[in-house]
Regions:
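Bacterial Sec-dependent N-terminal signal peptides
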Residues: 1-27
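Long, intrinsically disordered, low-complexity segments
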Residues: 18-19, 73-76, 83-86, 114-117, ...
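Membrane-proximal, proline-rich intrinsically disordered regions
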Residues: 19-71, 579-589
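Conserved, well-structured interaction surfaces
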Residues: 39, 43-47, 51-57, 83-163, ...
Length: 589
């Protein structure tokens, strides 16, 4: 544990809240512990704990702890490549190529941010339960603690899925004035304590909150269900998730794309949303700065010219291929090894200049979610016109022909959506948990429990929404249909599990989940080595054109140790007590 992280940090005092989102507030001064022993003080501490949800503000590099986990959950998976060019952010290249070492500063930044945030949560709990706080009712204190425990559960969850073997720090362990006293081993399983945080939050939070962005009962129950899901506790996870599905009042929005627009922030599908804001006096720091590198590389595109990172892979684009009946090209093996979608590539302009003649071949169908997720040449890009090709890509030969699209803003909304002096700072919230997550997690539970018909029902809810959503470009050949009655039961459990997993990929691509899903399913090594083997060689589109893919991936291998990231070397060094490190490194590093 990094010693300095557990010193009592100066805490921002926020005495009043205006019409801004409740944690988009400028620092107003430094408060003493005495001042914090009040309703306003506890509220300010809680704002501080919420404020780190976006991954920015703990002193680390912005993208090391971005809420969307685009490096650790996306670039490390088969969804995306690093992008940009070979020389930019080489530490990310090491992550992409599974060459992981404990002194990579990306790992330390994520660790530092996680435990800084946990410390803030513990401060809230300590002050909220202090008997010297006289101007809060017991109910108000309980709710403050419940919100802090929800956040503490989230931040520990983030650490757990990264490193597996991590210390759990609660308000009893936390000793800001005794850095060595807080040192805790990382050998115990912390899942029960994460569960306890979410369970307490679920029992003590209201179903709705007046201020958008605050945790609710349904957010806590959803997260508890997710924690149980990660442990393969299918029946227990189903209980929590089914309560959310049946009783939260949430429903799917009509258009898939409405989960990714500023105009539809905090919509009826959203269960827990990280709030972004702009023009609030912070210089754009509250505008999703963890993703500041992930914009097309030209001044005539969203973001206005930087920096070309986090680009969709050919494998991901091909995953959206469908057959003539609108169903995915997947097989009856749960690890996806019999899937055929990656046998032929979706036609693309890899290797061509934007000025070279090229026409998109639409002779085969794709799922319409593809063109709300990925920017590709010849297809309308929101209201920016047709994506022009390599002029939007920093180095197409290195990073490929596609660009991210899910979180991009409309040209017509640029002034209202972006910061006045930084077009890469936006007020488009990150939907951390939405009802579609809950539905597909329920589908996963049912498939694993053998209830295949019910699993199919849940999957079809998502596929029917995709079918009914507006298409991005009417000229594209799109086709998506629900599975026919009895398909899962007829084709068996392995097919059903694979279909659920594939649907999660299609629905949540480029949102930073894929790597962690592959790991928890126990198929990361097989899937990612197959991905590297195919993504590193020449491709061939169904139009017959051949092209070179990512040659730098040749010979790269994912091994069993890569299921967990290495614990930062500095954190192990700083955990020394009586000359011996308390933290233990993960196997293989």
């Amino acid at each position: 544990m990094k010693k300095v992280k557990f010193l009592l940090l100066p805490v921002v005092m926020v005495m009043t809240f205006g019409c801004q989102k409740f944690f988009d507030v400028n620092p107003q001064g430094v408060a003493s512990p005495t001042q914090l022993k009040s309703k306003a003080g506890v509220g300010a501490l809680l704002v501080g704990a919420y404020s780190l949800l976006d991954g920015v503000g703990s002193g680390t590099t912005q993208w090391h702890a971005s809420v969307d986990n685009w490096v650790f959950g996306g670039v490390a998976s088969d969804d995306a490549v690093k992008g940009t060019d070979a020389g930019d952010q080489p530490e990310q290249s090491f992550i992409e190529q599974y060459n992981w070492v404990a002194d990579n500063t990306h790992f330390r930044g994520k660790w530092q941010h996680s435990y800084d945030a946990i410390a803030r949560c513990n401060e809230v709990i300590l002050f909220a339960t202090d008997p010297d706080v006289k101007d809060m009712t017991d109910a108000e204190k309980t709710q403050a603690v419940a919100e802090a425990r929800f956040l503490r559960g989230h931040y520990h969850f983030e650490a757990k899925k990264m490193w597996g073997n991590v210390p759990y720090i609660d308000e009893k362990t936390y000793k800001p004035n005794d850095p060595t006293g807080v040192l805790v081993t990382n050998t115990a399983d912390i899942w029960p304590k994460i569960e306890a945080d979410f369970a307490f939050a679920a029992a003590n939070l209201p179903a709705t909150q007046a201020q958008k962005g605050r945790a609710t009962r349904w957010a806590a129950k959803s997260y508890l269900g997710k924690a149980l899901l990660f442990q393969k506790k299918w029946a227990a996870a189903k209980t929590e998730l089914l309560d959310v599905y049946n009783n939260s009042g949430k429903s799917l929005v009509t258009s898939f794309h409405d989960n990714f627009r500023t105009a539809t922030n905090n919509n009826r599908e959203s269960i827990f949303e990280v709030q972004f804001s702009i023009n609030d006096g912070t210089g754009g720091q509250n505008g999703g700065k963890g993703s500041t590198l992930n914009w097309p590389y030209t001044s005539t595109s969203p973001g206005r010219g930087c920096c070309g990172f986090y680009l969709p892979s050919h494998n991901l684009v091909n995953a959206y291929r469908t057959d003539a009946t609108g169903l995915p090209l997947i097989g009856a093996v749960a690890d996806g090894s019999q899937d055929t979608y990656n046998n032929v590539d979706v036609p693309n302009d890899q290797g061509l200049k934007f000025s070279d003649a090229w026409t998109l071949d639409n002779s085969q169908p794709v799922d319409p979610r593809l063109d709300w997720t990925v920017g590709r040449r010849g297809v309308t890009f929101l209201d920016w016109g047709k994506m022009p090709g390599s002029s939007w890509i920093r180095d197409q030969n290195y990073s490929g022909p596609f660009t991210g699209k899910k979180w991009m803003y409309y040209l017509s909304e640029e002034n209202s959506t972006t910061h006045a002096t930084d077009r890469r700072s936006v007020n488009n919230n990150f939907r951390l948990i939405r009802l579609s997550h809950v539905i597909l997690w329920l589908a996963e539970c049912e498939a694993e429990l053998g209830n295949l018909a019910q699993a199919q029902t849940y999957v079809n809810l998502i596929r029917n929404r995709a079918k009914g959503s507006p298409v991005q470009d009417a000229s594209v050949n799109t086709k998506v249909e629900p599975y026919a009655t009895g398909t899962f039961a007829t084709r068996g459990a392995a097919f059903a599990i694979n279909a659920v997993r594939h649907e999660q990929r299609l629905e949540f691509a480029m949102e930073g989940h894929r790597f962690f899903d592959l790991v928890r399913w126990g198929i990361a090594e097989k899937v990612l080595n197959a991905y590297v083997a195919k993504e590193s060689v020449s491709g061939r589109g169904w139009d017959g054109r051949t092209f070179t893919k990512r040659a730098y991936l040749v010979g790269k291998t994912f091994t069993a140790k890569n299921n967990l990231y290495p614990i930062p070397a500095d954190e192990i060094l700083n955990s020394q007590k009586d000359g011996k490190s308390v933290l233990t490194q993960n196997p293989g590093y």
